[in-house]
């Protein structure tokens, strides 16, 4: 499965933004231990973008060589994992959570399943609650919302807005 259109994305603070024109291919969840560590999570959702249709439109990511053949791109300011770049490949992988609209790309496969946490299949059965129902309730949710410095899910001319930092 591949999807054809224009995708934009970036880090949480807005220092790094990117654009993909055309197809995002092979959307998947990678459970390998390297991706777990790189994401600080149980898996890393990725999809590949052809290099010639991929562009960094703002800032410059930091890069970490996780092996001789792979580097991982991230925001140096906020730490958001953004890219998995197998250097010899004709594409770069973007992290699906960094897309401006992550609902646009649904994973179709799982990789690195030998490292998948054993209780992964049980996640959908966990109790659920809205953001404002957690610790601190509505008051905490309002304080976070009103002081939010997260970049919006669309391109802006500059970020952050004047006087917000």
State where each predicted segment sits.
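A short Gly-Trp-Pro
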Residues: 1-165
